[in-house]
Design a protein with these regions (language model features):
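Active-site metal-binding core of divalent-cation-utilizing nuclease and nuclease-like domains
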Residues: 1-21
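Composition- and surface-driven signal marking solvent-exposed, interaction-prone regions
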Residues: 5-8, 29, 40-42, 60, ...
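Short, flexible loop/turn elements at secondary-structure junctions
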Residues: 9, 20, 31-33, 66-69
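Structural beta-strand/beta-sheet cores of well-ordered domains, especially the beta-sheet scaffolds
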Residues: 12-14, 25, 58, 63
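Conserved catalytic cores of phosphodiester-cleaving nucleases, focusing on short active-site segments
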Residues: 16-18, 22-33, 47
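C-terminal, active-site-flanking charged/polar segments
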Residues: 22-24, 37, 45-46, 75, ...
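Mg2+/Mn2+-dependent nuclease catalytic core
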Residues: 32-50
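Domain-level recognition of nuclease-like catalytic cores that cleave nucleotide substrates
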Residues: 52, 56-82
């Protein structure tokens, strides 16, 4: 198990990267007003955060989590495996 927080790339910072059991999980966390905006997963995709981890040859899972500012609860949890 290897966990890295605020992992820097040439295009920004990955909120959390986890290498576990032959898989890589990249997390982006966003706070939104009320409803899901899809920005967390979109940031992982558009900034190419997975490129830093392709060298390991392991499955990579992009996980976008959005929290409601008012409810302080998860309003979206999007996953894409690449």
């Amino acid at each position: 198990l290897d966990i890295t927080l605020e992992n820097t790339t040439n295009k920004g910072r990955i909120d959390m990267a986890v290498r576990f059991n032959g898989n890589i999980y990249l997390f982006e966390f966003k706070v939104v007003e009320m409803v899901s905006e899809g920005k967390a997963l979109l940031q992982l995709q558009s900034r190419g955060y997975a490129e830093k981890y392709r060298q390991f040859g392991e499955p990579i899972h992009l996980i976008g989590v959005e929290f409601s500012k008012d409810d302080r609860n998860i309003v979206a949890f999007d996953v894409e495996s690449i």
